[in-house]
Amino acid sequence: MANHVSSYISFSDISEEAENWLDKLMPDYNTAVYEVLGKIYDKTEAEMDNWEWWNENVGSKWITFEDVSCDGVSTISAWSPPTLFYENLYKKLSSLNSPDLKMWVSYDDEMPNFVGV
């Protein structure tokens, strides 16, 4: 079984447009992971459904979203922090009239083998 890595993402200097986009990203807890990722990466589930894509674009074997709102994002991923996901989320939010966006991420492994900010 994979070690679970919890990530907590917060923002400052985020535009109203980006806040609204985040609030609509995961309308409820039944929202599929591929639906959330599809909005961030502008991809279909078929385009994202392979190990190579996950490795090159998310940085972990899988990811789940525990909470998504303009107040922050919390995720759980397998084996490692999804650093490439963080980068792509930042790029997406910056493109939504948030040129001064600041994003903080903290993560920890359940063992704990590692932690980071």
Language model segments and positions:
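Long, contiguous binding/interaction regions
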Residues: 1-117
